[in-house]
Amino acid sequence: MPSPGTERDGKIFRHRLSTRLWHWINAVAVIVLLMSGLTISNAHPRLYWGHYGANFDAAWLTLPRFPGWATIPTGYNLALAREWHFAFAWVFAFGLLFFMLRALMNGHFRRDIALGVKDVVPSHLWQDVKRHLRLNFETPGGGYNLLQKITYSLVLFVLLPLLILTGLTLSPGMNAVLPWLIDLFGGRQSARSIHFICAGGMALFIAVHLVLVVLAGPINEVRSMITGWFRVKGEQS
């Protein structure tokens, strides 16, 4: 298998097999988690802070009831939704662990995602923002641009771990094994609120990600995530 950065016939090898597998498996897992999570939310669409929250407590946010077409299962079935959620949560968690270990071993983090000293200079960030506003997403060598690095770092090292840890906190079985998690997040209801906020952040990330894929050229972007090869600008057919 070629190394990332290898050039051939106007294309650059961009994604290793481990990255591509994780991307598509994770995409399925996240969709199932979000849709089953909406069913779970429908059971009590109110969010609280602290250890307790019930019908007569003051909620900081009241959520809408989500329609059947947006939920798994499509009909209201809380027990089945929890089974779907729990099963794919393990796929999600172990998939993230596998990806992180592989990315550390093969240099993906260091080469493509890690932020250097020059990356955090405000002028560089502003230049990257202006390039995005002009719909110019190209970078030398076909690598990730600065906004991608920042976003992927926040998602991989903040958003996804928070989703997993707060999800574990909401599991009564895990409370017996890891009772300190409840105190870490300031109570079960606080963990539930943080979990929902992070899930909303994940949904927003996916929406923006899909829009940018379309704007950057969906055929080339999707092909690179299937085959690993990304056609550079000026060589596209």
Model region roles, listed by residue range:
Residues M1-S237:
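Membrane-embedded alpha-helical bundles that constitute the cytochrome b-like, heme-associated redox core
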